[in-house]
Amino acid sequence: GFLVIAALLSWVAFFRVGLGGGEAFTVPVLRFIQSGALQADWALRIDTLTVVMLVVVNTVSALVHIYSIGYMHHDPHRPRFFAYLSLFTFAMLMLVTSDNLVQMFFGWEGVGLASYLLIGFWYQKPSASAAAIKAFVVNRVGDFGFLLGIFGLFVLFGSVDLGTIFANAATYLPAEGAAETGVALDFLGYALSRESALTVVCLLLFMGAMGKSAQVPLHTWLPD
């Protein structure tokens, strides 16, 4: 019931912020990490992309929950199934509302954990257990690339805050025809310019998305 209400409220937010021209805003939650140059406070970022994803996550999750009430009615472990499903929804919401890359990574890994638990829900079956372990391991390969991409962004922009990164990204590269300003990132023994560093970081972030969305070559867990 609460998830249906959340889905309806997501549509309200979509029409007000996404289509209504409402301004993006941030809702502070708590102070999280402060260590040297690294500052990552827990906050909810609400902008056009966020409200679109809130509609997708909450609407689809509400429909899945409603369908599962009948589909799982015979299973004696139904409470555990709905706990895993709710954990998956929570992790997805944490991911899409994150205000910084550290918070996003927590949601990202939460989705991976919930996927592992759901895939291996009927753990008595060897095939289900094997599929869950395979999915977990393959996704960790992609997540390693994603984590390296986060480290790279912190080195390039000096922040993990999404607002700061978005604001500086447009002016990060030198103007057309201007000379490069030295080494921006050392990666695997290579001294990368700003343009090359951004390309490598984007590929590392994409590597994480490849694992989560089962794209070649990190697709082998999906058929199982």
Protein language model features and the residues they cover:
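...captures the hydrophobic TM-helix bundle architecture rather than a specific catalytic motif
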Residues: 1-224
